[in-house]
Amino acid sequence: MFKKSYQFFALVLFSIFNVLVTSASAIDLDEATRTVVADSNGNTTVLTPEQVKRGKRLFNNTCGACHVGGVTKTNPNVGLRPEGLSLATPRRDNAAALVDYLKNPTSYDGLESIAEIHPSIKSGDIYPRMRSLTDEDLFSIAGHILLQPKIVTEKWGGGKIYY
C-alpha cells in the first residue's frame, strides 16, 4: 500500500514539475522594445519575435564564447555597449553596420582588417561556425546585440561586476 502511494505521489510531483517547466516561455517584448536602428540614416526596423529568438540562439552559439554579456573577453576595452559601438569607425550602432562588420571585421578605428583574428564570413575557413550563416542570420545576431541594452540595461557590456 505504501509503495503504491509513494509511486502515485512521485508521479503527481513529476507531473506538476513538468507542467511548470514546459509552460515557461520567454518574455514577450513589445514592439517598441523590439525596434532597433536599421541603418546609418537612422531608419528603424521592428524585429519579429522569431528574429529575437533566433538572434539570441545564434549569438550564444557563435559569438557568446568571447562576447558573453556584451563584453569582449580578448579586449575588455572594446565591448558591445551602444556607446562603444557608436564611437567605432565606421559606427557600428545599427543593424546594417553590424552585419557588414560580421562579414568583414575591421579594427576599432576602421583602418585594418581583423578577419584573421575575429570570426567573420570572410574568415569562415578559420572559424567554421561562421560558414553557414546567412544574411538573415547575421541580421538576427545584429538585432540581438542592439536589443540587449534595452532588456538587460547597464549589465550589457558592463563587465565582471555583473557576471
Swiss-Prot record:
Membrane topology of this protein: Peripheral membrane protein
Domain of life: Eukaryota
GO cellular component labels: chloroplast thylakoid membrane; photosystem II
Positions contributing to heme c binding: C63, C66, H67, H118
MF terms (GO), sorted A to Z: electron transfer activity; heme binding; iron ion binding
Coarse class of the protein's main subcellular location: plastid
Cofactor(s) the record lists: heme c
Recorded coiled-coil stretches: none
Keywords tagged on the record: Chloroplast, Electron transport, Heme, Iron, Membrane, Metal-binding, Photosynthesis, Photosystem II, Plastid, Signal, Thylakoid, Transport
Record's signal peptide: 1-26
Co-factor binding comment: Binds 1 heme c group covalently per subunit.
Protein localization: Plastid, Chloroplast thylakoid membrane
One of the protein's GO biological processes: respiratory electron transport chain
PROSITE patterns, per database record: CYTC
InterPro entries registered for this protein in UniProt: Cyt_c-like_dom, Cyt_c-like_dom_sf, Cytochrom_C550, PsbV_cyt_c550, PsbV_cyt_c550-like
Protein family according to the UniProt entry: Belongs to the cytochrome c family. PsbV subfamily.
Subunit note: PSII is composed of 1 copy each of membrane proteins PsbA, PsbB, PsbC, PsbD, PsbE, PsbF, PsbH, PsbI, PsbJ, PsbK, PsbL, PsbM, PsbT, PsbY, PsbZ, Psb30/Ycf12, at least 3 peripheral proteins of the oxygen-evolving complex and a large number of cofactors. It forms dimeric complexes.
Function: One of the extrinsic, lumenal subunits of photosystem II (PSII). PSII is a light-driven water plastoquinone oxidoreductase, using light energy to abstract electrons from H(2)O, generating a proton gradient subsequently used for ATP formation. The extrinsic proteins stabilize the structure of photosystem II oxygen-evolving complex (OEC), the ion environment of oxygen evolution and protect the OEC against heat-induced inactivation.
Protein name, entry field: Photosystem II extrinsic protein V
